[in-house]
């Protein structure tokens, strides 16, 4: 194997109450893609922040191109040739695509004027390389979340770096966008660029990566060639044990109908009808832009309903705000936990109890003991890894943030729990814990809607599945009768009847 272009040796970093990195190591080789794997909280993000100078490491050594380095911050590391694509977007919606790509390093002439034509041309070339069908003069805020992620990737490519770190780069991408990204990764690999690829999607790791480095509890566990390992072995390295079946669905006798939606039309939703029983998990599948999240938000009251009926336990409800949804007994866990679900500057306790303050109050007085007791109970139940309940939630790993978001909804004691992409950006160990919690709520008779872009997840955890296409339901299946081919056919517009004709 050739010499590493980047070496991190014995990196240590501690925060109050927790040792985030304990002798962590990473080697990045030119012309190769190194997967950096580990559960949420394993230290992956902390290691990358230590590399780029966001955090000052307590001990260890970083060598880049054979020389010891210690970067003062991301700008310093970028200038040296190391770029990082963060999982959270670092862009400004009110600026154009080109302005976002070249923000802080605009191309100027001898008089200090911005060379707009050159900047737009270079930005357009980057977008074309990533197969993004937008002009760089367009405002970033007009793009979908996945397209904005591609702009973030284009921004990193514009630095012409020797090392590129990609943190969950496909999290918000469609399959087509992911294919375009992989094409670019292969081009970068051929050009000799070293890439660090952080992802919880094991399929992607085995498709695009050459080698794998695993961290667990901040410690270096090992480095392996992808060709020399398999999914089970990788999972065991990550979690320290072998996991049983991936989707632990349980069978529960369903109760009476809890939620009934009839001819519902609203923002992005057209004439949708379905029922949901007590103790049932209803999976909602479909491609990006099919109207899945919009349907959930109309039911919850976050988007406007134009016509149709919503009944909860036989009574018609009319949610026009999220507060109405909560008051009616509907909890919605957003797909965008950082944008809609959590307040990153508040503590774990404050976030978890945010929607339950009325229930936890007597008059205008908050019952602090009851609040603390409830929060501590959920921290234990969900196995949330946090030094204290007063830890700022922005300092937690993605998986632990997601657990807090779900606990926040459950603290309202809902009749219907809507989970929109509940395991997005969550590692395999935390996924298993979330699935087990979902089963527990199901066994207690809660009605659950599971919206997911991962078809195996929908098939593995649901009792019944509806598929959406262009704001309508294009198919409905019992889980036992469904497979990925049927779901995908309905997702692109075929009806259940057409599916059955093809199967026959």
Curated annotation (Swiss-Prot):
MF-aspect GO terms: ABC-type D-ribose transporter activity; ATP binding; ATP hydrolysis activity
GO cellular component, one term: plasma membrane
CDD domains membership: ABC_Carb_Monos_I (cd03216), ABC_Carb_Monos_II (cd03215)
UniProt EC number: 7.5.2.7
Keyword Repressor: no
Domain of life: Bacteria
Reaction(s) this enzyme catalyzes, per UniProt: D-ribose(out) + ATP + H2O = D-ribose(in) + ADP + phosphate + H(+)
Pfam families reported in the protein's UniProt record: ABC_tran
Keywords of the record: ATP-binding, Cell inner membrane, Cell membrane, Membrane, Nucleotide-binding, Repeat, Sugar transport, Translocase, Transport
Binding site for ATP: 38-45
Segments forming domain ABC transporter: 6-242, 252-495
Record-linked InterPro entries: AAA+_ATPase (IPR003593), ABC_carbohydrate_import_ATPase (IPR050107), ABC_transporter-like_ATP-bd (IPR003439), ABC_transporter-like_CS (IPR017871), P-loop_NTPase (IPR027417)
Predominant subcellular localization, coarse grouping: membrane
Protein's membrane topology: Peripheral membrane protein
Compartments in which it is found: Cell inner membrane
Family: Belongs to the ABC transporter superfamily. Ribose importer (TC 3.A.1.2.1) family.
Oligomer status and interactors: The complex is composed of an ATP-binding protein (RbsA), two transmembrane proteins (RbsC) and a solute-binding protein (RbsB).
PANTHER family: CARBOHYDRATE TRANSPORT ATP-BINDING PROTEIN MG119-RELATED, D-ALLOSE IMPORT ATP-BINDING PROTEIN ALSA-RELATED
Role noted for this protein: Part of the ABC transporter complex RbsABC involved in ribose import. Responsible for energy coupling to the transport system.
Identification of the protein by name: Ribose import ATP-binding protein RbsA
Species this protein is from: Photobacterium profundum (strain SS9)
Biological classification of the source: Bacteria, Pseudomonadati, Pseudomonadota, Gammaproteobacteria, Vibrionales
Gene that specifies this protein: rbsA
């Amino acid at each position: 194997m050739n010499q590493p272009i980047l070496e991190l040796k014995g990196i240590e970093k501690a925060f109050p109450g927790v040792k985030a990195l304990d002798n962590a190591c990473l080697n990045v080789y030119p012309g190769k893609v190194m997967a950096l794997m580990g559960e949420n909280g394993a230290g992956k993000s902390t290691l990358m922040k230590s590399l780029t100078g966001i955090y000052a490491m307590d001990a260890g050594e970083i060598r880049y191109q054979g020389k010891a380095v210690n970067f003062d911050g991301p700008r310093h590391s970028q200038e040296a040739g190391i770029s990082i694509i963060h999982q959270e977007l670092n862009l400004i919606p009110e600026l154009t695509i080109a302005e976002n790509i070249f923000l802080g390093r605009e191309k100027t002439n001898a008089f200090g004027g911005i060379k707009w034509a050159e900047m737009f041309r270079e930005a357009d070339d980057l977008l074309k390389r990533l197969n993004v069908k937008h002009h760089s003069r367009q405002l970033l805020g007009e793009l979908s979340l996945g397209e904005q992620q591609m702009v973030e990737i284009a921004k990193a490519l514009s630095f012409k770096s020797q090392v590129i770190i990609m943190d969950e780069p496909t999290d918000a991408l469609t399959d087509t966008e992911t294919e375009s990204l992989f094409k670019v990764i292969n081009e970068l690999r051929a050009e000799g660029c070293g890439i660090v690829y952080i992802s919880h999607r094991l399929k992607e790791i085995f498709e695009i990566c050459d080698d794998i480095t695993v961290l667990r509890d901040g410690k270096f566990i090992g480095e392996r060639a992808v060709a020399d390992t398999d999914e089970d072995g990788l999972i065991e390295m990550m979690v320290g044990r072998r996991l049983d079946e991936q989707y632990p669905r349980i069978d529960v006798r369903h109760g009476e109908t809890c939620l009934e939606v009839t001819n519902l039309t609203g923002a992005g939703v057209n004439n949708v009808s379905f029922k949901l029983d007590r103790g049932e998990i209803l999976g909602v599948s479909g491609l990006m832009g099919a109207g899945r999240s919009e349907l959930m938000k109309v039911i919850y009251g976050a988007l406007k309903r134009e016509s149709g009926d919503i009944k909860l336990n036989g009574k018609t409800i009319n949610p026009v705000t999220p507060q109405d949804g909560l008051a009616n007994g509907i909890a919605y866990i957003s797909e965008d936990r950082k944008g809609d679900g959590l307040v990153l500057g508040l503590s774990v306790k404050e976030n978890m109890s945010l929607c339950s303050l009325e229930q936890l109050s007597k008059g205008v007085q908050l019952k602090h003991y009851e609040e603390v007791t409830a929060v501590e109970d959920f921290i234990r139940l969900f196995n949330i890894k946090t030094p204290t309940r007063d830890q700022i939630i922005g300092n937690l790993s993605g998986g632990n943030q997601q657990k807090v978001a779900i606990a926040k909804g459950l603290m309202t004691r809902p009749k219907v729990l809507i989970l929109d992409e509940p395991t997005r950006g969550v590692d395999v160990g935390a996924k298993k814990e979330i699935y087990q919690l979902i089963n527990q709520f199901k066994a207690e008779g809660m009605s659950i809607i599971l919206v997911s872009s991962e078809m195996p997840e929908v098939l593995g955890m649901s009792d019944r599945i509806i598929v959406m296409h262009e704001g309508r339901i294009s198919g409905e299946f019992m889980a036992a009768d469904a497979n990925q081919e049927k779901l995908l056919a309905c997702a692109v517009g075929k009806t259940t009847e057409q599916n059955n004709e093809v199967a026959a």
